[in-house]
């Protein structure tokens, strides 16, 4: 069984590294990716932007997702927080929050959301990514 992971912030430094490392795993695959509305690559297939196999288009609106997702990784900016958390709540998707700079109110809301969703707050994935690359 494989896990389909959606990455919000997939075109950023960390998002690219994670997406490309997923190509080396059999148990997790990239389902799709999200970027800000100003990203010049919106609408393009991810495999034309990154060195990956995923053919889904880069999106900026979570409502445009029409494929299966098992979990979400957020490595985007805090500007995306509200839309992402609402999407995960609506779809009942577990997510890993690896972005930083959240307000106390946002962190408090995460605590509330964690009563109904599995949430991992991991604001520094540098060590984790290095370990993933070595495995």
Regions found by a protein language model. Give the residues of each.
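Extreme N-terminal starter segment of soluble prokaryotic enzymes
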Residues: 1-6
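N-terminal Rossmann NAD(P)H-binding glycine-rich loop of SDR-like oxidoreductase domains
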Residues: 7-11, 15-20
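NAD(P)-binding Rossmann-fold cofactor-contacting core
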Residues: 24-50
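Structural detector of well-ordered beta-strand residues that form the stable sheet scaffold
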Residues: 31, 59, 96-97, 118-120
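Glycine-rich, highly charged phosphate/nucleotide-binding loops
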Residues: 48-67, 73-81
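Structural motif
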Residues: 70-71, 94
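Rossmann-fold NAD(P)-binding glycine/threonine-rich loop
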Residues: 79, 84-90, 98-135
């Amino acid at each position: 069984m494989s896990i389909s992971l959606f990455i919000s912030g997939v075109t950023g430094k960390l998002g690219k590294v994670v997406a490309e490392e997923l190509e080396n795993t059999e148990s997790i695959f990239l389902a799709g990716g999200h970027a800000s509305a100003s990203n010049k690559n919106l609408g393009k297939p991810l495999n034309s932007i990154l060195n990956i196999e995923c053919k889904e288009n880069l999106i900026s609106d979570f409502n445009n997702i029409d494929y299966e997702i098992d979990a979400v990784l957020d490595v985007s900016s805090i500007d995306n927080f509200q839309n992402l958390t609402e999407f995960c709540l609506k779809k009942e998707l577990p997510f890993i929050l690896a972005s930083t700079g959240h307000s106390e109110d946002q962190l408090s809301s995460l605590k509330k959301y964690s009563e109904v969703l599995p949430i991992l707050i991991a604001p520094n994935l540098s060590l984790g990514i290095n370990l993933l690359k070595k495995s």
